[in-house]
């Protein structure tokens, strides 16, 4: 017998939609208002800078031809499927894990859309200190990192007792 979806972690899928809207909206604004390589200072140590990433994090495999586009798309789809299954198997009350999974799925889907639609991922956040610049990234990357950090954090938190779970 199947369980009602609202009692599962899938109840948190609305957060995937929020992440997607914010991520794709920010990328749309960059594509409409910036030429490749344009930079606008926001705050000291933070710029908006339009860059294209043909690889993965830190432009990993960016210069490997075109096969990595499909490789990373396959990884994103696989991760999304696994996390959706994990959300379905978890209770809606397991908030931290479900929020983490939703953030990762939303970020992965945002970058997957870019990869499939444009052939590259749109990056725009440039953090720097002095002359040192961190790799340019986007809001999808931020959601993925926050989700991963929440999963690690959850591993350090005390587990609820059987009484608290009931």
Curated annotation (Swiss-Prot):
Keyword vocabulary terms for this entry: Aspartyl protease, Cell inner membrane, Cell membrane, Hydrolase, Membrane, Protease, Transmembrane, Transmembrane helix
Membrane topology annotation: Multi-pass membrane protein
GO biological process: proteolysis
InterPro entries: Peptidase_A8
EC number(s) stated in the UniProt entry for this protein: 3.4.23.36
Signal sequence region: none
Protein's UniProt keywords contain Transmembrane helix: yes
The protein's annotated pathway: Protein modification; lipoprotein biosynthesis (signal peptide cleavage)
Cellular compartment(s): Cell inner membrane
Domain of life: Bacteria
Catalytic site: 123, 141
A molecular-function term among this protein's GO annotations: aspartic-type endopeptidase activity
Transmembrane segments: 12-32, 70-90, 102-122, 137-157
One term under GO cellular component: plasma membrane
Catalytically driven reaction(s): Release of signal peptides from bacterial membrane prolipoproteins. Hydrolyzes -Xaa-Yaa-Zaa-|-(S,diacylglyceryl)Cys-, in which Xaa is hydrophobic (preferably Leu), and Yaa (Ala or Ser) and Zaa (Gly or Ala) have small, neutral side chains
Enzyme class, spelled out: hydrolase
PROSITE patterns reported in the protein's UniProt record: SPASE_II (PS00855)
Chief location category: membrane
HAMAP family for the chain: LspA (MF_00161)
Known role: This protein specifically catalyzes the removal of signal peptides from prolipoproteins.
Similarity annotation: Belongs to the peptidase A8 family.
Protein name, UniProt field: Lipoprotein signal peptidase
